[in-house]
Amino acid sequence: MASGRITLAARRAATFVAAIAVAGLVLYAVAQVAGRFGVYDLTRDAGFTDHSLPPPDPRSEQELEALRRFPPGATKLQPLIDATATGGVLTLPPGLYAAPGLIDRKMRIEAQTGAIVDGGGVGSIITVNADDVSITGLTLRNSGERHETTDAAIRLRGRHGSFKDNVIENCLFGFELKQADRNIIRRNRIASRELPEALRGDAIRVWYSTGNVIEDNDIERTRDVVVWYAKDNRIAGNRIRDSRYGVHLMYAHGNAIEKNHFLSNTVGVFLMYANDTKIVDNVITYSQGPSGIGVGFKESSNTLVAHNDIFANARGVFMDASPYDPEGFNRFEMNRIAYNGVAIAFHSDWEGNAFERNAFIGNHRAVTVAGARSAKRNRWDGNYWDDYEGFDRDSDGKGDTPYESWSWADRLWMDVPDAQFFRAAPSLEAIDFVERLGAFHEPQLILRDSAPLFSAPQGAGVRRGEKSS
């Protein structure tokens, strides 16, 4: 009898644990769907969590103050802020100022050349918890280096702010926006701390924020410009180099990435679970190394990629399960994709992408598909392929026969990662030549463009001097 009661209790406990696990999986699935389809405001509107405040630092203000190290003669910034009236202007003459600074009301800080705010190597330098705040012409340096408290030059929680012509040096994070809408971040120079790439902070981190304009900034040696759960932001005219991700979108919809120059980053632009994005008029170059990608997609839909110059990357475009929406489409139009190791690399034989009027020039391989599959389920129409071997006898600008790309012995390095070491090596090229000559097995058709252009389309690539929409 006792053993029967124990068995019954064990069964009840197992049932309870299983029910908790199922409930957790259901809640996780709901959260994923909410993020995927842009349902942003569940917790904000219900008031469950106030994300507008920075995460608390476990150290007291007295402990932080004791840790800060400032240059001799630095003037404390906070008393100057406190003495400025609501809506007033704080003019900072040349000199050294000691952080931190907390702005909790509408005001402007206008710095003269040589005005420097030093963070003392601890915490964030300026925190903005108010709307309609402007900071112009200031140099901010030496934030803390703790990721768990997001030590930044400027932490922004307000709306309708303006942050222009500032210099950010040796700060872990540059700008950190959280529930901060419709701000302008323009013409700032941003560099992170001298740390390994993965340990640096983000130049600009946008979380849960809408309608911000990030333009004409000069960013180098940071980690990412990352946009999470944020929509309708415009990232334009920036120069981003020597970082990890130039721009990284996650669960972020309706954003525009226009007229930027991405140089020598690990990845130029990467979309993860991001829909309705515009990637237009960008120069994306020298994303090299094993992870090098010019533009990457992971389960992202309804993206326009147009008039970009995608040059000299390990992979010009990388596609993974995109578009994810069964009714969605990604469009690639009028891009110059040139001198890459692989122009377009598909992780699988996914469908729903259209490539029209692009110029493929000087790539070692135009298109690859992992897993011995093909890209035929995507639309290829009217592109220029520099290895096209047909004629244009009627002079209509299009080839008389379709362009076809086949895989022969090069299937080896497409499917076996270790074999990529031999890509373009004489040994593998010789095998490929013999394979084509003897046709010992049936090659695989990778793609067919039924109306290939006979010359590169006029106007492909970045439109110089034109304003993006």
Report residues per predicted region.
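Extracellular beta-strand/beta-solenoid scaffold signature
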Residues: G119-T127, H147-R155, N170-L177, E197-W207, ...
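N-terminal Sec-pathway targeting helices
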Residues: G4-A23
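Extracellular beta-strand-rich solenoid/capping regions of secreted or surface-exposed proteins
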Residues: D82-A85, L96-E110, V117-G161, L172-A180, ...
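Membrane-interface motif at the C-terminal end of an N-terminal transmembrane signal
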Residues: V26-T43
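Functionally critical loop-and-helix segments that line ligand-binding/catalytic clefts
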Residues: D41, G47-L53, P58, P290, ...
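Acidic Gly/Asp/Thr-rich repetitive segments characteristic of extracellular carbohydrate-active
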Residues: Q62-A99
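Extracellular beta-strand solenoid repeats
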Residues: T91, L102, E110, D118, ...
